[in-house]
């Protein structure tokens, strides 16, 4: 579901916006849960069969983040950080370079190993490096407060930035969700967001798409 897709613009986004404001009034953390669900739906729209990958990444990195924050011994924290970064890079490399490695093995050793032909999961580079940045901040003591799974999930799968980024700091992003005024309907912010969307659509549909022809 691309941002200039009519399904996104006229169905998904308006429904999410309305339900977000409703959820914000319902309970303290309902807006977080709702945006996480919306993010998973947005991701699964691309390929529902590969969507468990981002769920696995979220759960594993959430666990590593807690291990790093709860471990008082610096050397142990460093080892946990190194292991977590290695696993994240390996996770990314398997999907990105597995067939490249197999092709070179076939060429160098004159064998005929079958290619894996793995599909490249949507936004895997983005959410991998986003979670690595989170783990590094946990190690450096920048993220000290206890993180709820819903918060970390939202940090990773927030749909407006999931496809194109940018990679942001956890504390900076979550501070915006924690701000009560951001959970209220604000006419000025609404029109500002609408203008930004229209500018983005103009750049994409009118300029970028036509320049590539």
What is each model feature region?
Residues 1-213:
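Membrane-embedded transmembrane alpha-helical bundles that form the catalytic cores
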């Amino acid at each position: 579901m691309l941002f200039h897709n009519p399904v996104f613009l006229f169905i998904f986004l308006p429904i999410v916006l309305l339900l977000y404001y409703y959820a914000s009034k319902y309970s303290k953390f309902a807006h977080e849960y709702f945006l996480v669900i919306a993010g998973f739906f947005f991701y699964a729209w691309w390929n529902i069969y590969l969507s468990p990958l981002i769920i696995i990444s979220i759960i594993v990195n959430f666990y590593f983040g807690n291990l790093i924050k709860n471990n008082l011994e610096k050397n142990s924290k460093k080892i946990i950080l190194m292991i977590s970064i290695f696993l994240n890079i390996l996770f990314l490399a398997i999907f990105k370079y597995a067939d490249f490695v197999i092709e070179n093995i076939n060429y160098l050793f004159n064998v005929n190993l079958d290619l894996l032909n793995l599909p490249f999961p949507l936004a895997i580079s983005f959410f991998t490096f986003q979670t690595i940045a989170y783990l590094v901040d946990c190690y450096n003591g920048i993220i000290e407060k206890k993180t709820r799974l819903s918060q970390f999930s939202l940090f990773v799968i927030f749909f407006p930035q999931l496809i194109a980024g940018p990679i942001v700091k956890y504390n900076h992003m979550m501070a915006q969700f924690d701000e009560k005024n951001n959970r209220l309907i604000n006419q000025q912010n609404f029109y500002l967001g609408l203008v930004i969307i229209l500018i983005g659509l103009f750049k994409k549909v009118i300029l970028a798409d036509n320049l590539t022809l």
